[in-house]
Regions:
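Conserved catalytic segments around the Walker B and adjacent sensor/switch elements
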Residues: 23, 44-63
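Winged-helix-like regulatory helical subdomains adjacent to P-loop NTPase cores
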Residues: 203-328, 334-335, 363-375
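Conserved catalytic cores of phosphodiester-cleaving nucleases, focusing on short active-site segments
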Residues: 413, 441-443, 447-458, 473
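Active-site metal-binding core of divalent-cation-utilizing nuclease and nuclease-like domains
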Residues: 416-447
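Walker A/P-loop-proximal flanking segment of P-loop NTPase domains
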Residues: 1-42, 112-116
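Nucleic-acid nuclease catalytic cores
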Residues: 463-467, 474-502
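Conserved Walker B catalytic segment
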Residues: 99-170, 177-184, 464-471
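Conserved NTP-binding/hydrolysis module of P-loop NTPases
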Residues: 49-50, 62-89
């Protein structure tokens, strides 16, 4: 398990000790619940911590004020009794009164909570996990409004020392979710919340530290730093993705052919295999992603433009689709532009988009029909893939407009390639080089890598520069052969496939 000591220390010093009320809102399975659980242990010496989970409350508990107040008081008292037995004597009378009468509302509940906080021998920290469970209920918004009121008056009226809410939605978007009319979208009932900016992703150092502990127990002989960096390259530190890859490697890979030895499992090849296993599973995180993409079509269209067209979209968290993508953990800011949060998300989304489009795609069908001829002795003949793609693309789309090809050309190639490598290989788009004119695709097939540059052709000078860039990129990957697919709109273009030599590099170039 990745150590959270540094994160817990930061939260305590920057927020809890300073009496802050705040929200930890991150994407699904981003370590929120784990952080709250560990933070509770970390705070117990100085504070009384009441940690609640709103998933314990059903929708019936939010039907009205009285029902919610009674349910909240009940879960609060049970949690306090279970976890703070040593403090119970001094607080017993306040606890007894907290449940109140059946017809008491939120105002009466907060009066009793104030008395409880006044009687407490130590400051009380309130944590509420899964606040999204309450997000469609007006009574919860009113609960937040009273928290805000007591927070502002706490110099005169005792109340919680610190309040921590955790969920996917931030408070502003809880309001948006409840009342989507434009005039109400941004009226937060809880604008006293401190901004929570602590990075909850795992760094390469944290991943390495976890692998080091594993290595001390199992002696696999792995390259710890190299493995940590490779895992980070796929996940960007998204907690559940890091832990899932490691779990597949620990539990599932040793049962597969070629991975009988632990040194084979804990290798870059093992990571690639674990990633492939992860992408083939319907994990809750992926299910949630599909659901949100269906709900927010503009966000989905933006992701398609980024991945398929290499479109550069300026980063602005005020833009609704970008804000939602950040909140769900699907997007991030990168050099002033919007980017998909990590490589695994990119691979999953590409698989999803292509699977949906493959049903009606002529290019996918062409790749599927002739897929077997591209495999020779267990190796993928990428030059032949290029030759056949040029043939099929010219037959189907040769007379299409420049705008149509510029927008869709790269998507057609990826649709063509997918059935050829499906089940055996995989590919991802290199974010470092993705732009409106140039995109690099890296294909993995049975341990062999192919670097493919997809490029919109804009004259000889630009083309020669693209060839040089690809040669430099091959140096980075320590490879001598690369592939260049140019979508050329010059009427005098020479359609076909040829080989170009730059220094000791061979570039197979296809022009369509």
């Amino acid at each position: 398990m990745v150590k959270l000591d540094r994160r817990l220390e930061q939260i305590k010093k920057m927020f809890v000790d300073r009496k802050k009320y705040f929200v930890i809102n991150r994407g699904r399975q981003y370590g929120k619940t784990t952080t709250l659980r560990e933070l509770k242990k970390y705070l117990l010496e100085e504070y009384i911590v009441v940690s609640l989970d709103f998933q314990e409350l059903g929708s019936a508990e939010f039907v009205d004020e009285s029902t919610f107040a009674r349910a909240f008081a009940d879960i609060f008292v049970r949690t306090l009794e279970r976890n703070t037995a040593s403090s119970m004597k001094e607080m017993s009378e306040s606890l007894t009164k907290l449940r109140g009468n059946d017809d008491d509302g939120l105002k009466e509940l907060f009066v009793r909570l104030s008395h409880l906080c006044a009687d407490s021998p130590r400051p009380i920290v309130l944590m509420i996990d899964e606040v999204d469970s309450a997000s469609n209920n007006q009574v919860f918004i009113e609960f937040l409004a009273l928290l805000r009121k007591y927070y502002l008056n706490r110099d005169e009226t005792p109340i919680f020392h610190s309040v921590i809410l955790a969920g996917v939605y931030d408070i502003k978007n809880l309001k948006l979710k409840l009342r989507p009319e434009s005039e109400h979208q941004y009226n937060s009932p809880w604008n006293i919340a401190a901004k929570f900016k602590i990075d909850m992703s795992f760094s390469t150092d944290q991943i390495a530290e976890m692998l080091e502990e594993y290595e001390s127990d199992y002696h696999t002989g792995m390259d710890i730093d190299g493995m940590a960096e490779e895992i980070y390259q796929y996940t960007s530190g998204y907690p559940v993705l890091v832990s899932s890859i490691c779990k597949y490697m620990d539990e599932d890979l040793p049962e597969e052919n070629g991975f009988e030895q632990s040194s084979k499992v804990w290798s870059k090849k093992g990571i690639k295999r674990a990633v492939k296993m992860l992408l083939s599973e319907n994990i809750p995180l992926f299910d949630s992603m599909v659901k949100q993409l269906d709900l927010y079509r503009e966000m989905r269209e933006m992701m398609e433009q980024i991945l398929y067209q290499g479109r550069k979209i300026s980063f602005s968290p005020a833009e609704k689709s970008i804000n939602l993508g950040l909140m769900f953990g699907f997007l991030k800011e990168e050099n002033g532009h919007v980017a998909v949060a990590n490589r695994i998300f990119e691979m999953y989304l590409m698989d999803l988009f292509i699977a949906e489009e493959s049903i009606r795609s002529d290019m996918y069908l062409c790749g599927q029909v002739v897929r077997n001829q591209y495999i020779e002795g267990g190796r993928l003949n990428m030059k032949l893939v290029f030759e056949k793609f040029v043939q099929h693309f010219t037959e189907i789309y040769g007379s299409s407009t420049e705008k149509f090809i510029e927008t869709n050309g790269r998507r057609f190639f990826l649709l063509y390639l997918k059935p050829i490598i499906n089940g055996t290989g995989n590919y991802y788009i290199e974010a470092q080089t993705r732009d409106a004119r140039r995109t690099d695709v890296i294909v993995d097939y049975l341990g062999e890598q192919f670097i493919i540059e997809l490029k919109i052709w804009h004259g000889n000078e630009y083309n020669e520069r693209g060839e040089k860039q690809l040669a430099e990129y091959l140096d980075y990957y320590h490879m001598n052969k690369g592939y260049l697919l140019s979508f050329n709109f010059n009427q005098k273009k020479e359609i076909g496939v040829k080989e170009i030599f730059i220094g000791n590099k061979t570039i197979v170039e296809a022009v369509v």
